[in-house]
Curated annotation (Swiss-Prot):
Its cofactor is Mg(2+). GO terms for molecular function: magnesium ion binding; phosphoglucosamine mutase activity; phosphomannomutase activity. It comes from Burkholderia thailandensis (strain ATCC 700388 / DSM 13276 / CCUG 48851 / CIP 106301 / E264). The keyword Metal-binding applies. It holds the Pfam family PGM_PMM_II. It catalyses: alpha-D-glucosamine 1-phosphate = D-glucosamine 6-phosphate. The gene is glmM. This is Phosphoglucosamine mutase. CDD domains: GlmM. HAMAP family: GlmM_B (MF_01554_B). One of its GO terms (cellular component) is cytosol. It is an enzyme of class 5 (isomerase).
Amino acid sequence: MGRRYFGTDGIRGKVGDAPITPDFVLRLGYAAGKVLASAPGRAASGARPTVLIGKDTRVSGYMLEAALEAGFSAAGVDVMLAGPMPTPGVAYLTRALRLSAGVVISASHNPYHDNGIKFFSADGNKLPDETEAEIEAWLDKSLDCAPSDGLGKARRLDDAAGRYIEFCKSTFPAAFDLRGMKLVVDCAHGAAYQVAPHVFHELGADVIPIGVAPNGFNINDGVGATAPDALMRAVRANHADLGIALDGDADRLLVVDHTGRLYNGDELLYVLVKDRIATNGQVEGAVGTLMTNLAVEVALKDAGVQFVRAAVGDRYVLEQLRERGWQLGAEGSGHILSLDRHSTGDGIVSALLVLAALKRSGKTLAQMLEGVTLFPQKLINVRMKPGADWKGSDAIRRAIGSAEQALAGSGRVLIRASGTEPVLRVMVEARHAADANHHAEAIADAVKQATA
């Protein structure tokens, strides 16, 4: 049976609509607490489980934090509160403090009226599917509050930000610093606003922070990795060397160079792989997704690096990396994984890896990507009737086949259904924008006619 609440990145939705309601989140905390308390070795040791709760800057975070805390306490689980903290910061602190689990209250790059809950295991990794299934099973049981002498306690982790800042700095080579560099750092009015500027400043950079005035309602609003125009303008206006864009929970990274040019996760993955080759002699392989630009795949293979495409979602990139024992993977949206540095995607750490690569090479980003020109992509979202059988359409198959034949060796076609709405996403990639547009529109027209 499929999971009812957990998606690929925890539980997410609009605040006030099920399941992001205070009563459900309280029960979720209780259910998760009971699963933690019954973990192998926990009952035998008699030790009380302790979880860390962090959040981003959405106004609803206060309400959901209180609900989670109450649920965990009712299950007999102690709670440590980190306050506003990037998602990767919660993952790190959970592991570093030897806690039972970490919980993040965030909807990442979504607007303020959405929120979500995601969990990390004791080792700083996202929960396995079977543990999420156990939590869902407990949600169906009655909430039996622990006796007063068995209730969990809560306390604030006062030095959470400082601990995470030091961790981030430790991933930057000791032989380097950022003196003489002017950086614009866009924190998206999100979880990194008290952390990211300090990391780069303490490494010596002249930091110009933007997106650091959260009010509960402005997270990701015209700033951050989902709206990089603000950063591009700020870099040019301040004559900065580089701009760093994070999203609301700081697990994504986009970079802007001194000219205002934007670099996405695909391009940054190539830069990091090339840096590892220069440093270590070789990189066996890297992981992208179905959406990774074909030009990056071609360039990596030309460099002798195997390339594997995972399903869309950093969870699936991580699965492929672990399966193969590789270190580097990314999504074009800016989720970058470097498993020898962190167990999860970390925008700040990824930025430091890019800066270290530039320091080592003595090159600019444009120079490191010389010869790699991203293929134009055309994406068309076609709305269909719910349940429409697009896979059974001969007309759609013919349109796809015609495009693939025309683009053989110089482009690709990707058709996938949305998991949240009756929409078919048609993406065509080609060396020339006109070809991508032509074939995408032809396929989209076939879909519209076949599913009308």
